């Protein structure tokens, strides 16, 4: 059974959230201001019940509505900062970064064994990737409340919005 069918079956059987958090292996790349050279990770994301929000590295990434890519080329947007991200499944050939991009992809240490299985390798290619243990915990409860609060996030009626493909930022990110 493929990943999507398995996920849909959990939702239909009302088991989502009762069996522990669903984790999906994904490639995540920051697009805002970086084109194809932004920071990039391979790690486990936790999807919301609808699958429209992914939680990873302290962020809530909401799927863009309408056209798949915004001005920056991303298909997800950080609900707090408004930064654009590209999120996709990992490629079996291990060449996840765009051909025009550069920089190493950080592989989450907790996802390393699963990633190596997917690409059919025994070791990581050190010229393209490196292992990291700096992935932050994500406060899913807080971000979920933020995403579901009224009047925030995506416009209720995209047809009436000035730009139906733009995301309305919810809050300002706290200075760390």
Task: Enumerate the predicted regions with their spans.
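Mixed-charge, low-complexity intrinsically disordered regions
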Residues: 2-44, 53, 59-176
């Amino acid at each position: 059974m493929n990943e999507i069918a398995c996920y849909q079956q959990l939702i239909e059987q009302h088991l989502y959230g009762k069996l522990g958090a669903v984790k999906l292996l994904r490639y995540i790349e920051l697009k805002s201001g970086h084109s194809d050279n932004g920071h990039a990770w391979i790690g486990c994301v936790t999807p919301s019940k609808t699958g429209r929000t992914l939680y990873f590295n302290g962020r809530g990434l909401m799927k863009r509505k309408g056209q798949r890519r915004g001005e920056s080329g991303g298909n997800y947007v950080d609900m707090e900062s408004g930064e654009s991200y590209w999120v996709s499944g990992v490629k079996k050939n291990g060449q996840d970064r765009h051909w025009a991009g550069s920089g190493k992809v950080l592989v989450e240490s907790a996802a390393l064994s699963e990633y190596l299985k997917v690409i059919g390798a025994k070791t990581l290619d050190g010229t393209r990737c490196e292992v990291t243990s700096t992935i932050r915990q994500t406060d899913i409860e807080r971000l979920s409340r933020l995403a579901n609060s009224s009047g925030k996030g995506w416009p209720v009626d995209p047809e009436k919005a000035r730009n139906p493909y733009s995301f309305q930022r919810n809050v300002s990110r706290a200075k760390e």
